[in-house]
């Protein structure tokens, strides 16, 4: 049996973010999705996941999941045999983004989670295409499933994260970097920088996709993953 593959979802997403990948890759290996919840710091979430995962595994994170993945590599580099970073950001959060999150937290505490998620997802997450409305509804369903406290904790974790430049420079394992061509939240430039920092890395741009290529273009995403994992 091949090495286990652990997926880490983006903000307010659950295992459904990786449904096409779970279906494809569970045929040949153990696949699991670790929840990015329970703590209000990236360090805390990463430590908790490391306690519950196999001794060694392939790690794949998208967006917030990619940020957590980088912290897991920092904490336990010997346990990750291959690294996949998708539509993510290695930098500390900008002050203006943190200020926006504070306002979102206030709104969520007032019971306006759906409104906040709708305003955040529509302009930032998805490429224009036939699947957009379906994926929007799925994102809303995932957020509703996770609830207000998860939003608050994840927002605080993202706001307090630190720069992982030095972590990326030290990565020795094979690393795959994926980015949706039209990702406005974590643009291609960020992933080009990650590819430069990680010496043993490969960068692929996914066409017809924005911030969630695992759902927007699963065929292309799975094809690249399958070839790279061989």
Residue positions per predicted region:
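Conserved HGGG/HGGXW glycine-rich cap/lid loop of the alpha/beta-hydrolase fold
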Residues: 1-43, 62
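Conserved alpha/beta-hydrolase catalytic His-Asp/Glu region
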Residues: 93-96, 113-169
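Short beta-strand/loop motif that positions the catalytic acidic residue
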Residues: 171, 177-179, 183
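Catalytic histidine-centered segment of alpha/beta-hydrolase-like enzymes
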Residues: 209-218, 222
